[in-house]
């Protein structure tokens, strides 16, 4: 088949949105002719990577680099400006796609990035079957969980909720939903925001994925359990819940350690929260290269995720893939990743309840490590069956028939 991908963000060796675009492009190209429309600023890193990694540089993979006039790049500064810049880029990308389709006659077009249902895509104009997503953006901090936010953070959350409603009245988004042959959403929260009349063609599928499964790192009983949390240290990631859970049981179990990997504006606040344990039993790790993350996770015994509105959670997907037992608050992407593991999920009822529940699961790991090693093996097998991008593509092709 000939496939066209719209991937505004698409770069090798990157996480988040660029990694999503790249992994879908690479995997499709193993089976089909693929054209990828992406931003022109991605060109240097893509070309450099393909020159170094010749196994990815095959005749099936074609990149079309689309840019906007330099005078418009100032719009990329700030949230509102970025949305406008992205919309203008999408309009131009659609025109490029229409012209390209006249020559190549694509079997279908898929919008891959940005992974947000609240931002416009114009690929419905190409005139071939459209797959929209996986997209996200329907997630919010659960009403029952009250976290401290400054004025700026509160405004961000208010704007987010407003944009979720506004999206359903945006003409380009409505046309995309109507025209799409299939709609893939990354979370159950986003699925619930898709109008009922389109639910029969809407499927839940994590947007993120891994190219190939790493080898499982065999876990065993240890006298000094090490817990790891990873991600951006920002307010809605709620690392404070994990730290407070650790503090609840730290005195009873003096052998455990908590390690935190990530940077962000909450770092100093979190370090202060660790109190007397900072540098002794609570450690903030230095940055780890993307290609070294699996080896890094192998040093730990339990992964905790406390994010309150994440659409994907690549860090947890990587941890499960390498055989590290994971627990998480059951919201957004983490809730999807652990949907088959009720014993590892913390329901988002209230802030204090989440702290207590996470502490209880840590304690359960300490007291019943063998059980959790078995859970980790089950999670690893589940990851092998559902997290690999090839399986997502196979599912799409099967569903389209």
Each language-model region and where it sits:
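A conserved mid-protein helix/loop that constitutes part of the nucleotide-sugar donor-binding site
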Residues: 19, 225, 232-248, 265-268
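Nucleotide-activated donor-binding/catalytic signature segment of Leloir-type glycosyltransferases, i.e.
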Residues: 269-288
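Short alpha-helical donor nucleotide-sugar binding micro-motif in glycosyltransferases
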Residues: 287, 295-300
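Aromatic "clamp/platform" in nucleotide-sugar-dependent glycosyltransferases that forms part
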Residues: 308
């Amino acid at each position: 088949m000939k496939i066209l991908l719209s991937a505004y963000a698409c770069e090798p060796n990157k996480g988040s949105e660029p990694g999503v675009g790249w992994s879908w492009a690479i995997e499709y190209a193993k089976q089909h002719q693929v054209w990828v429309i992406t931003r022109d600023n991605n060109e240097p890193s893509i070309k450099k990577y393909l020159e170094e990694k010749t196994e990815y540089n095959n005749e099936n993979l074609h990149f079309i680099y689309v840019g906007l006039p330099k005078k418009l790049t100032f719009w990329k500064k700030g949230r509102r400006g970025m949305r406008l810049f992205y919309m203008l880029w999408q309009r131009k990308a659609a025109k490029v796609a229409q012209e390209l389709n006249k020559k190549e006659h694509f079997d279908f077009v898929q919008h891959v990035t940005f992974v947000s249902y609240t931002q416009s895509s114009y690929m419905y104009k190409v005139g071939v079957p459209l797959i929209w997503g996986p997209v996200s953006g329907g997630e919010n901090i659960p009403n029952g969980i009250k976290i401290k936010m400054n004025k700026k953070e509160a405004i961000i959350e208010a704007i987010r909720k407003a944009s979720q409603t506004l999206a359903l009245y945006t003409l380009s988004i409505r046309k995309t939903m109507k025209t799409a042959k299939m709609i893939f959403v990354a979370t159950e929260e986003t699925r619930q925001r898709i109008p009922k009349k389109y639910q029969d063609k809407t499927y839940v599928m994590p947007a993120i994925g891994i190219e190939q499964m790493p080898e499982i790192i065999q876990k065993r009983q240890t006298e000094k359990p090490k817990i790891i949390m990873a991600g951006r240290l920002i307010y809605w990631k709620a690392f404070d819940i994990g730290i407070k859970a650790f503090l609840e049981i730290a005195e009873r179990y003096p052998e455990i350690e908590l390690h935190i990997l990530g940077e962000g504006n909450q770092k100093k606040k979190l370090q202060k929260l660790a109190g007397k344990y900072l540098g002794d039993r609570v450690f903030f790790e230095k940055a780890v290269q993307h290609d070294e993350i699996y080896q890094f996770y192998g040093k730990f015994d339990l992964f905790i995720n406390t994010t309150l509105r994440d659409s994907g959670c690549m860090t947890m997907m990587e941890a499960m893939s390498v055989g590290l037992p994971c627990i998480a608050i059951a919201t957004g992407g983490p809730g999807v990743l652990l949907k088959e593991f009720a014993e590892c999920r913390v329901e988002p009822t209230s802030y204090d309840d989440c702290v207590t529940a996470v502490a209880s699961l840590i304690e359960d790991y300490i007291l019943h490590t063998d059980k959790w090693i078995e859970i980790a093996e089950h999670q690893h097998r589940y990851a092998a069956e559902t997290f690999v991008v090839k399986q997502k593509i196979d599912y799409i092709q099967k569903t389209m028939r």
